[in-house]
């Protein structure tokens, strides 16, 4: 038999085998259902342990299903177990969690979700704001430092309040001291009261206080091209910028030292948040009417410090305080 003929016969045999495998693969049914992961928070602390379980996979014949798990980039191989326990590392980043459901004679299905490791503090998730270089001093509530600085004739706190009322970002408690919390109108006033000491009195700033701040910053062109650029911090969250460059605003400089972060706003009833990377919103002490209060806000792509109204009970904004 010639070599060419042998090669031809071999190719035909391989093609038949391949076709048979394709037919087998195509004829293998999938497990039923949509596999999801139960017990995984969106944000976790360094070293936090979680216990995860699968939900939604169904065997068409009621047979046994085998589950396997993998967390990347921490794991290179799947671990076969139904209820999976995992301790996240101290590295601040987003991890992908996979769960695979398989059964003999069926094509497996996979569920996937994410968890981000976050931490507060100078070496934490927020970088780009050097509070110790900007601030004049610090006041503590429990273990949490609140930095403050004199801007013009006023003394302002430089980081968002995080005392335990209001709601945290996406209702994740571990984010409380990272972005600060979102408070309704009445909670905002109480948050500033928590800073009071024997020698210092702190209050929620009025509209007039904010307007004084605005006039001082806009009168100092060295702070930045616009008030938005001068008040927003060039902050990053786990290495990702919280801001984009807009020619109308100019380079984000934080020249005033105010260190605003565009972390959006909340519905304190639904415990949901929106507008991150777009708005930095702060309550004032002034009522607009019986059901609404005034707030001040920055928009990442627009120059100006604007005024809005929010429901006293359900609208959640960040809080800064002024020393009186």
Show which residues each predicted segment covers.
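Coil residues (strongly favoring Ser/Thr
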Residues: 49, 80, 91, 137-138, ...
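Conserved positions within compact, well-structured domain cores
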Residues: 120-324
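Surface-exposed, short loops/turns at beta-strand junctions within beta-sandwich domains
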Residues: 88-94
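Surface-exposed, flexible coil segments in extracellular/virion-facing regions
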Residues: 68-87
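Solvent-exposed loop segments of extracellular immunoglobulin-like
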Residues: 58-68
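A short beta-strand segment in extracellular, disulfide-stabilized domains
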Residues: 43-58
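Bacterial Sec-dependent N-terminal signal peptides
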Residues: 3-6, 11-41, 106, 110-134, ...
């Amino acid at each position: 038999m010639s070599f060419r003929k042998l090669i031809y016969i071999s190719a035909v045999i391989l093609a038949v085998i391949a076709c048979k495998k394709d037919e087998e693969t195509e004829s293998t049914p999938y497990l039923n259902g949509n596999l999801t992961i139960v017990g995984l928070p969106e944000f976790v602390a360094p070293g936090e342990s979680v216990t995860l379980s699968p939900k939604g996979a169904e065997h068409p014949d009621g047979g046994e299903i085998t589950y396997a798990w993998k967390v990347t980039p921490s794991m290179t191989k799947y671990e076969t177990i139904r209820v999976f326990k995992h301790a996240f590392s101290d590295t601040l980043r987003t991890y992908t969690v996979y769960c695979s459901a398989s059964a003999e004679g069926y094509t497996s299905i996979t569920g996937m979700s994410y968890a981000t490791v976050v931490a507060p503090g100078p070496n934490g998730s927020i970088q780009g704001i050097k509070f110790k270089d900007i601030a004049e001093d610090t006041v503590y509530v429990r273990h949490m430092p609140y930095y403050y600085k004199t801007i013009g004739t006023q003394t302002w706190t430089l980081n968002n309040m995080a005392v335990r009322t209001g709601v945290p970002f996406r209702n994740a408690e571990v984010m409380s001291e990272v972005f600060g919390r979102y408070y309704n109108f009445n909670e905002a006033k109480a948050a500033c009261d928590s800073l009071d000491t024997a020698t210092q009195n702190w209050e929620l700033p009025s509209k007039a206080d904010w307007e004084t701040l605005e006039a001082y910053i806009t009168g100092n062109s060295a702070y930045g091209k616009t008030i938005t650029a001068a008040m927003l911090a060039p902050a990053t969250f786990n290495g990702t910028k919280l801001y984009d460059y807009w020619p109308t605003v100019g380079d984000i400089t934080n020249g005033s030292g105010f260190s605003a972060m565009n972390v959006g706003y909340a519905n304190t009833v639904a415990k949901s948040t929106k507008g991150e990377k777009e708005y930095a919103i702060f309550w004032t002490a002034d009522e607009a009417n019986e059901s609404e209060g005034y707030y001040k806000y920055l928009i990442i792509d627009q120059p100006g410090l604007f005024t809005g109204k929010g429901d006293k009970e359900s609208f959640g904004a960040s809080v800064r305080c002024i020393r009186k």
